[in-house]
Curated annotation (Swiss-Prot):
Protein's name according to its UniProt entry: Myohemerythrin
Subcellular location as annotated: Cytoplasm
PANTHER family: BACTERIOHEMERYTHRIN (PTHR37164:SF1)
Subunit annotation: Monomer.
Cellular component, GO, one term: cytoplasm
Predominant localisation class: cytoplasm
Keyword Lyase: no
Lineage: Eukaryota, Metazoa, Spiralia, Lophotrochozoa, Annelida
Molecular function in Gene Ontology: iron ion binding; oxygen carrier activity
Binding residues annotated for Fe cation 2, in chain numbering: 60, 75, 79, 108, 113
């Protein structure tokens, strides 16, 4: 299923997973992608986004592991594939790559992360 990309591109309550730390981190990821969209030529902004994403994925995966979440391995693979894709992107970042990142985050939260609601 493909979910609608919000405009303006920002987190709202429809993305809530009901774990405060993860919701706050998701808000930061939306902001990081928006910042990159606003400054696609800035390699520093791209590097900050990659770091934010890696840190969030680590936190999320640690929560999953601590609760023996059954889909941890497949979730980690989805994360690592996205990080690998992002690390292949260079500044200036194309509109196509910004769109890809926006769509990936929205679809990942609503299509994949929502599966762990109430399980962590």
């Amino acid at each position: 299923m493909v979910f609608e990309i919000p405009e303006p591109y920002q987190w709202d309550e429809t993305f809530e997973v009901f774990y405060e730390k993860l919701d706050e981190e998701h808000k930061g990821l939306f902001k990081g992608i928006k910042d990159l969209s606003d400054s696609p030529a800035c390699s520093e902004t791209l590097e900050k986004l990659v770091k934010l994403i890696e840190d969030h994925f680590t936190d999320e995966e640690e929560m999953m592991k601590s609760k023996s979440y059954e889909d941890l391995d497949s979730h980690k693979k989805i994360h690592s594939d996205f990080v690998e894709t992002l690390k292949g992107v260079k500044a200036p970042v194309s509109e196509e790559n910004i769109k890809m990142a926006k769509e990936w985050l929205v679809n990942h939260i609503k299509g994949t992360d929502f599966k762990y609601k109430g399980k962590l």
